[in-house]
Design a protein with these regions (language model features):
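Trp- and acidic/polar-enriched beta-sheet ligand-binding modules for extracellular glycan
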Residues: 502-564
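Single conserved hydrophobic/aromatic residue that forms the stacking wall/gate
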Residues: 1-8, 13
Length: 565
């Protein structure tokens, strides 16, 4: 699995033999040969292949583990690797000790890196790898700055896990680590919004800070081909930040990737760039050229039931172009692997365009008092919505953010709001009860935990789930999370996995039939999995609370409520 493409001609690979608990083990012969071949191809293409090890979760700060790590590096060296990194990110416990980290890294630097003239400077990713997670009072970053050998490069994601790099932000970290930061820019990585594609322009990073960085890393999506648009752009930024032109580079990248259908791919990418609501609160512009028309039409139609023919015509043309571009791109599937990767999103994009045109047809039919045409178009819209639902439930069914979302920032809200408005108008005028709902989330997540409160909920038939988070969650003392259901349901069970075995010592699980009165629920535990049988008890809300005053560290791997619908 590629975890990061280090522009400036570097590549970093992460796999099951780089991290706990297998980091001490050698690669099996087959995997070692594959890795050796990959390193060889990288070198032939003038790419520094960086191999990273992630030992922090179970490392023992003793001579034995130190020598095991050094031995692993030697094995990788004999496979051709000449660039190395040690990651201490997303861990908890004793492995986060900055003094011990520095001692280990300095030992590697002095007994491995510096004795081999063809090995590049060592890279490390700290436990506190962004400003929002740092605790200056504990001095973690300043300890690294003081104790790490000056040649060791320290990675940094910015003010938050997902953030653009600013002048103030880079100065803040450099002052503490006493060296230029090695920026790990978490874009276009989508492992927290896996139902979205991030294919828009690369922008937001300060163009005057090149001298304050020792490196710049782009973390790609799991879609290697679709990530090339952003990688191309970040490479251009890293080559010469001061002369970087976001829009031109984006267009050039698309032309380079798919010259025979660049117009269509550019159109699709322009409407598939935002991340949607997410726990990191990082958003991107989307449908930029359509935004003024969409805002004008939506405000006028929802408030006054009026619109200009110019706005209407632009929307019609946009929806038609969505259909056409999808078909043209699908026809290129045998010519470029990027189309195979994004195929489900192309299906969804086309259906959304068809839905948009039919919703506009409903508007015209209503204006003309043509009930027959209105009902025909209404039924077609509902059928298209069902098809989009099936695609969302069928493709890309990962355990984190399953499904297929497209054009979600401007186009889909416009279509949904217009459909709801015209259907409600029709119901009022003709005393009908047509369903005006589009897809929506009926349930609510409420929390005073900053890393949890913005996470999206998922609904799959009778299961309500909090989208899992990959990083360590710091759960404050007496903090809680609550899932509030839209109505009372018979409860079947609750499953919780916080990645730690001692949850029962500090956590309390409760249910409520009215959202006001709470009763504690007992649960069974097998390793890290907590299970509570609700035995058809009525539930309107579920709450989990840290009953202690001190902060707890968890991994939010599973929180699922199963109801009887």
């Amino acid at each position: 699995e590629i975890c990061a493409c280090l522009v400036g001609s570097e590549m970093c690979i992460r796999d099951s033999y780089h991290s706990s608990p297998n980091w001490r083990l050698p690669y099996p012969e087959k995997e070692a040969k594959q890795l050796q071949e990959l390193v060889k191809v990288a070198q032939e293409n003038e790419i520094d292949f960086v191999w990273a090890i992630h030992p922090g979760q179970d490392i023992k700060w003793n001579k034995e583990d130190c020598e095991l790590l050094l031995a692993k590096f030697e094995k990788m060296y004999h496979l051709g690797v000449r660039s190395f990194a040690v990651f201490f990110d997303d861990i908890s416990g004793e492995g986060t000790n900055p003094v011990k980290q520095a001692e280990l890294l300095n030992y590697i630097d002095e007994h491995f890196v510096k004795v081999k003239p063809d090995v590049t400077p060592l890279i490390m990713c700290p436990t506190e790898y962004n400003k929002s997670w740092s605790d200056p009072a504990k001095g973690y970053l300043t300890t690294l700055g003081d104790k790490l050998n000056p040649s060791i490069q320290i990675m940094w994601t910015g003010d938050r896990v997902i953030s653009d790099i600013t002048q103030d932000g880079i100065q803040w970290i450099n002052d503490r680590i006493k060296r230029p930061a090695y920026i790990w820019w978490n874009f276009p990585v989508s492992d927290y919004v896996r139902d979205h594609l991030l294919m828009g322009p690369v922008y937001g990073n300060d163009t005057q800070i090149a001298h304050q960085m020792s490196g710049f890393v782009t973390n790609p999506m799991e879609h290697a081909e679709a990530s090339k648009i952003a990688i191309y752009s970040v490479a251009s930024y890293a080559w010469n930040p001061q002369k970087y032109n976001s829009e031109k580079t984006w267009k050039d990248a698309i032309m380079n990737i798919l010259p025979d259908a660049a117009t269509e791919l550019e159109f699709f990418a322009a409407h598939n760039s935002d991340l949607g609501p997410n726990g990191h609160k990082y958003r991107r512009e989307e449908s930029v050229n359509l935004q003024p028309t969409a805002q004008s039409f939506t405000e006028s139609y929802i408030k006054n039931k009026t619109y200009t023919e110019k706005d209407f015509s632009i929307l019609q043309e946009t929806f038609s172009q969505m259909i056409e571009s999808s078909d043209i791109l699908v026809a290129h599937a045998d010519k470029n692997p990027i189309i195979v990767e994004i195929m489900p999103w192309l299906y969804q994009f086309k259906l959304l365009g068809e839905t948009g045109n039919e919703v506009l047809a409903m508007v015209k039919a209503y204006d003309k008092n043509d009930q027959s045409l209105f009902m025909r178009k209404y039924k077609h819209v509902k059928a298209l919505q069902q098809q989009m639902f099936q695609i969302d439930q069928t493709y890309n069914q990962n355990p984190y953010q399953p499904g297929i979302k497209t054009a979600g920032r401007v186009i889909k809200p416009l279509i949904d709001q217009t459909f709801a408005t015209v259907t409600q108008c029709y119901n009022q005028k003709y005393s009908t009860l047509l369903n005006a709902e589009t897809d929506y989330m009926p349930h609510k997540l409420i929390s005073d935990i900053s890393q949890i409160k913005n996470l999206p909920l998922q609904v799959k038939i009778n299961r309500i789930q909090i989208s899992p988070a990959l990083e360590v969650i710091k759960w404050p003392g007496n903090g809680s999370l609550t899932i509030e259901l839209d109505q009372v349901y018979p409860g079947e069970n609750i499953e919780i996995d916080f990645g730690k075995p001692e949850i029962a010592t500090w956590g309390s699980l409760e249910i409520s039939a009215n959202g006001k009165d709470w009763s504690k629920v007992n649960f069974t535990q097998e390793k890290n999995l907590l299970t509570a049988s609700l035995q058809q008890k009525p539930i309107k809300a579920v709450r989990f609370t840290n009953m202690q005053h001190q902060e707890q560290e968890i991994y939010l791997r599973r929180f699922i409520i199963t109801i009887d619908k």
